[in-house]
């Protein structure tokens, strides 16, 4: 399984940052109109893929700007749409000129300033990132999940109001496997079936929830999990790049994973 991605960092002055924060929560229709080529999702002609994954998620993630920085991830077909993404950010933030861009490498370090797209973009492999993350979780049985923006997960037709470790882990696996299947190389589906079964062994040992910002719904806070973290930790770690739940492509459901022991 694999998926090509590009990670970008865009510095923002304070007024532009606040406008983008507002746009991500209130102007999603405008963003989808700007990025029509990426938001026009069509079902695959492969009936088995549709049965397993249904409608694909959007192949990009615009993080909520923080501390003067907007992080952006482009996956698969979105990489070729970099000019449209830059134009969208420029327009919604009300910038007079396109912003500076910084491309990131496998370690999250800046390797290229002002990429213009095409062959010069440093394209990363999710499989490569997974390989790099795996040693951090060797013999790991406990990890911490830090929910940084409200997570809105649906289960059995209802929105979860508290953190549930099994649903969280399986949600990350579903999002990861769906994006890989639709926009990359799916690999062996039995791998995700096995991991989903392992996720049933994740249990919550410490919860420190936080209230969602005024006017927003979702789960926030820090949660400590025990279970088969050596097997699931690397994929949860890399899954953090993709966010999770409702509004994931627009900054919601941002999280970080940290091995504890």
Regions found by a protein language model. Give the residues of each.
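RNA-interacting cores
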Residues: 1-261
